[in-house]
Amino acid sequence: MYVHVKVAVIYHSLTEQVCRLALAATDGAWDAGGEVRLRRLGQLVPLGEMHLRPDWVEVLRETECMPEASTADLEWADVALFGAATPYGAMLDHLTQFVDATVPLWRAGKLAEKVYGAFTPAAAVHGGQNGRLVSLTDVFHHWGGIVVPLRPCDPISRQIGHPEGTTLLARRGAPLAGELAAARSQGQRATETARALKAGRRLLADVA
């Protein structure tokens, strides 16, 4: 039975780390046969401040052709994976603004029964990665979503240290091969889980 699965990978990044994780998660979803929309959240940093960080400007230049995320992408998707940095262990304003805009969809019940997951970097070993993942998971619960963690017995999951989602240590620079493999595995597992859920619901509907 063929089951089409639509995946939205939505991220915010001023450095390459989150973008690389988002691309890896996208690859994993593709490997699992998903139709994927890779979307970036818009920038809230004033241009005057942006130009004080040439590395930020370079990332923006490289990703400016990528479509910005909208709540329509979330409504469209069977799977939504969110990625953003972890400033002081808190949720970025960019992500909070996007979540606030989903209220009409939430009230209409259009965010329930979807598969969700998250990934994040932080500058320090204990820089709040777990708190960020848990805070996003709380949002997914309020939406009525189905949260899919990493594979618990996969050595990759043990390597990155957080079963809730892919994390990395940003101060090392570019993501390590194991961190990218974890994001790829996360995208693949979320897509496979959504396909199984859709197939099961279809069978139940046929029986009914």
Task: List each language-model region with its residue ranges.
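Noncatalytic linker/hinge segments flanking ATPase motor cores
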Residues: 48-52, 120-128, 155-163, 189-193
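Short, glycine-/small-residue-rich phosphate/pyrophosphate-handling segment
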Residues: 112-158
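N-terminal beta1-alpha1-beta2 submodule of the flavodoxin-like/Rossmannoid cofactor-binding fold
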Residues: 1-110, 169-208
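Mobile beta-alpha loop/short-helix "lid" or hinge segments that flank ligand
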Residues: 41-46, 144-171
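Short, charged/polar low-complexity linear motifs in solvent-exposed/disordered segments
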Residues: 108, 130, 136, 145, ...
